[in-house]
UniProtKB/Swiss-Prot annotation:
Superkingdom of this protein's organism: Bacteria
Location of the protein in the cell: Cytoplasm
Native source species: Lachnospira eligens (strain ATCC 27750 / DSM 3376 / VPI C15-48 / C15-B4)
Entry-linked PANTHER family: 60 KDA HEAT SHOCK PROTEIN, MITOCHONDRIAL
Matching InterPro entries: Chaperonin_Cpn60_CS, Cpn60/GroEL, Cpn60/GroEL/TCP-1, GroEL-like_apical_dom_sf, GROEL-like_equatorial_sf, TCP-1-like_intermed_sf
Gene Ontology BP, a term: protein refolding
Family matches, as Gene3D superfamilies: GroEL, GroEL-like equatorial domain, TCP-1-like chaperonin intermediate domain
Subunit: Forms a cylinder of 14 subunits composed of two heptameric rings stacked back-to-back. Interacts with the co-chaperonin GroES.
Lineage: Bacteria, Bacillati, Bacillota, Clostridia, Lachnospirales
Sites where the protein binds ATP: T29, I30, G31, P32, D86, G87, T88, T89, T90, G413, D494
Protein name from the UniProt record: Chaperonin GroEL
Length: 541
């Protein structure tokens, strides 16, 4: 495929044009008075959103050179979203400001490599200042405020705070679309896994089609049970004690399943069998989790244990078990606390070592089931368009809250960047030449988020920036009420992690783009013309 190449200022101008087209679209959403953007979809209704990364991902430009610039800024939003889960619009606005300011200096003859060095020093200085301003999140109220600022909705903030309080830091909160118009929070206590009863005959409540076992014994094995003789010794002990039994096995089939069902229906004993959750090595680990949670053992030939030798003291115990068609919940397992804590520590260590996103997600789920719990927020709305938009806001709020718990909070509304810029201004005085200009690019860019928040509120950004800069750390501008307040006291908070990540990622992409000297793009080739069809059939009358 043929290539088109542009050099120097022409190349950078084309990239800058693409950057501006994408950033100008995204930045209209910043702040409490930011607007929404409507995205056309190839199928279904258009999507209305104010989520920076969703808007950025949807933008493709016709001009190949401009599109490359847009894709680079898209990288800023995506990277910030991956690291912090929020702050994508802020990162885009910062990157645009750095690129625009940097381009002016390159045109004036600055050396891009030395500029980059100055930008890096100034960013490190600002990040240090942000860390110094950060305050630990204390209590449910602050969590609710962080979530409310991110989602732009106090009700959402309260719901996320409730969910965080219920499941703790190790818990998992999932967001789903509701079948109703109401947004609801469901908490699943205990360990839940997505396997239900093997046979509907095992249900104890035929109306709800579920089986509830109080204080059952739990047989955990990775084997397939097809011969009743294998589990007969332990079944006899269960019958004599009059206890209930939950069997978790790879499968229960044939004669064994028939015998269990017949005896259940006769009332000989109360038993429910479910298939083991997960697959392969993950299944072995999940069975071990269940065993530790319930104080039982995994009956496995790998461990030298046979089903026929199983005794009641090898079985797990729980306060109650609820089994439905497609999931099982074990509540209040009777495992030793120190064993559960050791298992939690082991999973946390694995979480830190793994690089796979999929593995991280699965380990986090296991951790939640053992230590925290699982909360499900079901987002409801009148229309599908509104529901999708609400779901994106809810996800942002949740990510912002997690980031806040991790690294603390700083004053919101772009004010943290203005206060950090005071430290950067001191650094600028110690630098010289193009390195100084590079630091000044960051100094100017730090004003951009607050400037655009004010602009979207119909106010003059420069005046507000100067007023905030002159005030003490923590003071900022509440664009919704149009007044200067202590942002921490007013509950206008940003997670320090989001603030830091947005700046670092913006600098990374902007400084790389400014060092570009040539750009190579594919030349679009026209599709070959269709061969002409025969006009007629020669020789025919």
């Amino acid at each position: 495929m043929a290539k088109e190449i542009k050099y120097g200022i022409e190349a950078r101008k084309a990239l800058e044009e693409g950057v501006n087209k994408l950033a100008n679209t995204v930045r209209v959403t910043i702040g409490p008075k930011g607007r929404n953007v409507v995205l056309d979809k190839s199928y279904g209704a258009p999507l209305i959103t104010n989520d920076g990364v969703t808007i950025a991902k949807d933008i493709e430009l016709e001009d190949a050179f401009e599109n490359m610039g847009a894709q680079l800024v898209k990288e800023v939003a995506a990277k910030t979203n991956d690291v912090a889960g929020d702050g994508t619009t802020t990162a885009t606005v910062l990157a645009q400001a750095m690129i625009n300011e940097g381009m002016k200096n390159l045109a004036a003859g600055a050396n891009p490599i030395v500029l980059r060095k100055g930008m890096k020093k100034a960013t490190d200085c600002a990040v240090e200042a942000i860390a110094g301003m950060s305050e630990k999140v204390t209590g449910k109220d602050q969590i609710a405020k962080v979530a409310a600022i991110s989602a732009g909705d106090e009700e959402v903030g309260q719901m996320v705070a409730d969910a965080m309080e219920k499941v703790s830091n190790d818990g998992v909160i999932t967001i789903e679309e509701s079948k109703t118009m109401k947004t609801e929070l469901d908490l699943v206590e205990g360990m839940q896994f997505d396997r239900g009863y093997i046979s509907a005959y095992m249900a104890t409540d035929m109306d709800k089609m579920e089986a509830v076992l109080d204080n059952p014994y739990i047989l955990i094995t990775d084997k397939k049970i097809s011969n009743i003789q294998e589990i007969l010794p332990v079944l006899e002990q269960i019958v004599q004690s009059g206890a209930k039994l939950l069997i978790i096995a790879e499968d229960v089939e044939g004669e064994a399943l028939t015998t269990l069902i017949v005896n259940k229906l006769r009332g000989t004993f109360n038993v429910v069998a479910v298939k083991a959750p997960g697959y392969g090595d993950r299944r072995k680990e999940m069975l071990k989790d269940i065993a530790i949670l319930t104080g039982g053992q995994v009956i496995s030939e790998e461990l030298g244990l046979e089903l026929k030798d199983t005794t009641m003291d090898m079985l797990g115990r729980a306060k109650s078990v609820k089994v439905q068609k497609e999931n099982t919940v074990i509540v209040d397992g009777e495992g030793a606390k120190e064993d559960i804590d050791a298992r939690v520590a082991q999973i946390k260590a694995q979480l830190e070592e793994t690089t796979s996103e999929f593995d991280k997600e699965k380990l986090q789920e296991r951790l939640a089931k053992l230590a925290g719990g699982v909360a499900v927020i079901r987002v409801g709305a009148a229309t599908e368009t509104e529901m999708k938009e609400a779901k994106l806001r809810m996800e942002d709020a949740l990510n912002a809250t997690r980031a806040a718990v991790e690294e603390g909070v700083v004053s919101g509304g772009g004010s943290a960047y203005i206060h950090a810029s005071k430290k950067v201004a001191e650094l600028v005085k110690t630098l010289s030449g193009d390195e100084k200009i590079g630091a000044q690019i960051i100094l100017k860019a730090l004003e951009a988020p607050l400037f655009h928040i004010a602009y979207n509120a119909g106010l003059e950004g420069a005046v507000i920036i100067n007023k905030v800069r002159e005030s003490e750390v923590g003071t900022g501008f509440d664009a919704y009420k149009e007044e200067y307040v202590n942002m921490i006291d007013a509950g206008i908070l940003d997670p320090a992690k989001v603030t830091r990540s947005a700046l670092q990622n913006a600098t990374s992409v902007a400084s790389t783009l400014l060092t570009t000297e040539s750009v190579v793009a594919n030349i679009k080739e026209d599709a070959p013309a269709m061969p002409a069809g025969g006009a007629g059939m020669g020789g025919m009358m």
